[in-house]
Structure formats: C-alpha cells, structure tokens
Amino acid sequence: MPPRNMHLFQRRENRIPMEIPVILDGHRLLPGAEATFTENVSAKGARVVSVRRWEKDAPMILASRTGEFRSEARVAYCQTLRGDGYAVGVEFLATSGRWVVES
C-alpha cells in the first residue's frame, strides 16, 4: 500500500520556482479579488498562496497584476500552510495574453 501523501500521478510539465504577483477572483463564499503571488509556475498552471481556503475543482480567475495574462482556471488542490494561508494548485483552462512560461 502506498504512503498516504504519495501522489499517484506524474506531472506532465516541470514546475519552475518563481514569485509572480497575481490576482485571484471568483471565490464562492468570499467575493472580491485577492492580490497574492505564485510559488511555482508551469505553462499549464501555478501554485499560489492564498489567505482563503478554496474547494477542489472550484472555478476561479487568475490574472497577472500587470494585466498581461488572464485565465479561467480550476482549483486542482488546496493545502493548509504552516502558519496562515493555503497553497492552491491552479490549472489554467481558458487563457488570454502571455504567461511567464509557454508550452
């Protein structure tokens, strides 16, 4: 039996550690935009830090604070961080503009 925390899948793309200022919007219970940053990025998604707990598969909008990129997205996971906040895995669905990593 595999350990509880072992992922049973392998990522298709590499994650690059990079702090990018972003805005999250679309939380079902807490309306309003949240200014935050990424921890790592790929061409198809990002891991962001949020003060809000997001539900898996919830829709959201992620946009760069510069306005150069915007994506309808899906929450892939939400993990509690030590201290305050959450690490949220975001999968890009419908994008416009230029992201920091291209496929």
Question: What are these language model-derived features?
Answer:
Residues 34-36, 71-78:
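Short beta-strand-centered aromatic/proline hotspots
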Residues 20-27, 57-69:
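Short conserved beta-strand and strand-loop elements enriched in small hydrophobics
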Residues 27, 43, 78-83:
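Short, conserved beta-turn/loop elements at beta-strand boundaries and strand-helix junctions
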Residues 20, 71-73, 88:
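Hydrophobic residues positioned within well-ordered beta-strands of beta-sheet architectures
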Residues 53-55:
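Short, well-ordered loop/turn sites that connect or cap secondary structure elements
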Residues 8, 58-60, 74-77:
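Short beta-alpha junctions and helix-cap segments that line functional grooves
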Residues 46-50, 81-93:
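Short, solvent-exposed secondary-structure boundary/capping segments
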Residues 1-41, 51, 95-103:
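N-terminal helix initiation/capping motif
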